[in-house]
Curated annotation (Swiss-Prot):
Pfam families in alphabetical order: DUF896
Localization: Cytoplasm
Listed name of the protein: UPF0291 protein BCE33L1708
Membrane-spanning residues: none
Domain of life from the UniProt record: Bacteria
Keywords: Cytoplasm
GO cellular component labels: cytoplasm
Family: Belongs to the UPF0291 family.
Amino acid sequence: MKNILFRINELSKKEKATGLTVDEKQEQQMLRQNYTQTFRGSLDSILLNTKIVDQNGLNVTPAALQDAQIRLKLSK
């Protein structure tokens, strides 16, 4: 993940300074898509394993999140 982000930043700096070749532009787009998918997957995983509890110990997790958590458990 760090390598992908490093290369994205490297290409971005080069784009601002001198521009990118067609191959570099394609690489940049592919890396950005890969990074975005990985980031979203990590965030989804975190959210789907989250339970929100108020001060009284009651589960106040939003209904939409609870539904998604149930669907995930059913699909496993």
